[in-house]
Swiss-Prot record:
Coiled coil: none annotated. Disulfide bonds: none annotated. GO terms for molecular function: aldehyde dehydrogenase (NAD+) activity; ATP binding. This is Protein YeeZ. Gene3D superfamilies: NAD(P)-binding Rossmann-like Domain. Residues 1-24 form the signal peptide. It comes from Escherichia coli (strain K12). The keyword Transport does not apply. Keywords: ATP-binding, Nucleotide-binding, Signal. Pfam families: Epimerase. CDD domains: SDR_a4.
Length: 274
């Protein structure tokens, strides 16, 4: 039985843990509160208290138990803005250093397509990164640091906008006026992210960088009003910006071509969302 440690048993990490456990993996994980630890344990996931303040705070015995694994999956989201970005960078680096000290051979890090910034047109993994937010810049720096680590295999998944239970896109712009209505959406369902991580854990070696994004990209001025109506909310209004370019379309096909991955939910218009 393979062992996997998941740091960040949140919206993505907890369903991932449950899915891997059901597949026969031995899963450990971390939460930032004692109540969260107990809730995870009640769900059958061996969990430990781990905080970033900004330094990594975890009981040494708990850290040893958490890091007794064949792979580490880091699903901690970077903050969108505000102070703490440098804390996130420091804490993740400390976490990875601890994993290396415990000789974990495989690391998977969930990054974001925000590292591409305002890129235009089709965006592939080889597209130059040009983040425009603090969190995007921190993720870019972390990606570079992880990619150059000696003695371990790191996979980086650049996730598009996440949707699924509790994250219905009909709420994103309901009742608002927003720009760039003609631009396509870049979204991915929770289950497809879980599927991609599971596939990578089963792959013989790492070192991959993949965009994870649904293949279909309906226009914002079609998609978001339809999603809002499904919830009985006021549809958003979109204005077409003459100077905003054609927008970016995240190409998530490389993982399909290289590893045979198949998106369960390729079209955001028909994804199960609640």
């Amino acid at each position: 039985m393979k062992k996997v440690a998941i740091v960040g048993l949140g919206w993505l990490g907890m369903p991932l843990a449950m899915s891997l456990s059901a597949r026969g993996w031995q899963v450990t994980g971390s939460k930032t509160t004692q109540d969260g630890v107990e809730a995870a344990r009640m769900s059958g996931i061996d969990s430990y208290l781990l905080r970033m303040e900004p330094e990594l705070v975890c009981d040494s015995d708990d850290l040893d138990a958490l890091m007794d694994a064949d792979a580490l999956v880091i699903t901690l989201p970077a903050r969108r803005s505000g102070p703490g970005d440098e804390f996130y960078l420091q804490a993740v680096q400390e976490l990875v250093d601890s994993a290396l000290a415990h000789r974990i051979p495989r690391i998977i890090f969930t990054s974001s397509t925000s590292v591409y910034g305002d890129a235009q047109g089709t965006v592939k993994e080889t597209t130059p990164r040009n983040p425009v937010t603090n969190s995007g810049r921190v993720l870019e720096e972390l990606e570079d640091w992880l990619h150059n680590l000696p003695g371990t295999s790191v996979d980086i998944l650049r996730l598009a906008g996440l949707v699924g239970p509790g994250r219905h896109p009909g709420r994103f712009f309901a009742g608002k006026t927003a720009p760039d209505g003609e631009h396509g959406v870049n979204l991915v369902h929770l289950e497809d992210v879980i599927g991609a991580i599971t596939l990578l854990l089963q792959a013989p070696k790492g070192g991959h960088i993949y965009n994870i994004c649904a293949p279909a990209h309906p226009a914002r001025n079609v998609f978001y009003p339809q999603m809002a109506r499904l919830l009985g909310l006021e549809p958003p209004q979109f204005r077409n910006s003459l100077d905003s370019g054609k927008g970016k379309i995240i190409d998530g096909s490389r993982i399909c071509n290289e590893l045979g991955f198949e998106y369960q939910y390729p079209d955001p218009l028909v994804m199960p969302l609640e």
